[in-house]
């Protein structure tokens, strides 16, 4: 019975590359000279930290970072969970953005419900942070992929692990 999985995993190599590109742009820009503007990635905790002198500067850093991220992985900005801007020593500010990885249980339940309501001849089951979809025909599975990618637009979902 053919099957595939819906997953949502961040491309950490592409993300690290986008942050390196942004750091180089910050170093080269005239308006960032002599400021504390920088971008850091904590791969272990999956957190991006933006440092700057003001909220405006954080917005400028985001304007550099987000297109670089989108270039590496489409819709990757949607997986960021923006935390509050925090004042740190002196007049500096920082903002953390957590990288949401995997499909949480609420989204998995939503996917299963959409598949069942779509009246396709497939079965969806939640397996940890993935959703496995099984069906008798490949055409049904392709219809399921089209339904889910059209319905869920607020979070980047990938499909793979096709089996015959």
Curated annotation (Swiss-Prot):
Domain of life: Bacteria
Pfam families in UniProt: DUF520
Keyword terms of this UniProt record: Nucleotide-binding
GO CC field: cytosol
One MF annotation (Gene Ontology) recorded for this entry: nucleotide binding
InterPro entries per the UniProt record, alphabetical: DUF520, UPF0234-like_C, UPF0234_N, YajQ-like_sf
Listed HAMAP family: YajQ
NCBIfam families in UniProt: PRK05412.1
UniProt family annotation: Belongs to the YajQ family.
Task performed by this protein: Nucleotide-binding protein.
Name of this chain's protein: Nucleotide-binding protein Daro_3028
Taxonomic lineage from the root: Bacteria, Pseudomonadati, Pseudomonadota, Betaproteobacteria, Rhodocyclales
């Amino acid at each position: 019975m053919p099957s595939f999985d819906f997953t949502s995993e961040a491309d950490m190599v592409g993300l690290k590359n986008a942050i390196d590109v942004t750091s180089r742009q910050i170093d080269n820009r005239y308006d960032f000279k002599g400021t504390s503007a920088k971008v850091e990635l904590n791969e272990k905790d999956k957190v991006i930290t933006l440092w700057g002198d003001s909220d405006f500067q954080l917005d400028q850093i985001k304007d550099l970072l987000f297109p670089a991220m989108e270039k590496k992985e489409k819709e990757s900005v949607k997986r960021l969970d923006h935390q509050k801007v925090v004042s740190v020593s002196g007049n500096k500010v920082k903002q953390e953005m957590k990288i949401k990885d995997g499909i949480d249980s609420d989204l998995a339940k939503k996917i299963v419900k959409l598949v069942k309501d779509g009246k396709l001849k497939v079965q969806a089951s939640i397996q940890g942070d993935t959703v496995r979809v099984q069906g008798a025909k490949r055409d049904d599975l392709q219809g399921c992929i089209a339904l889910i990618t059209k319905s869920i637009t607020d979070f980047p979902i990938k499909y793979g692990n096709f089996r015959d």
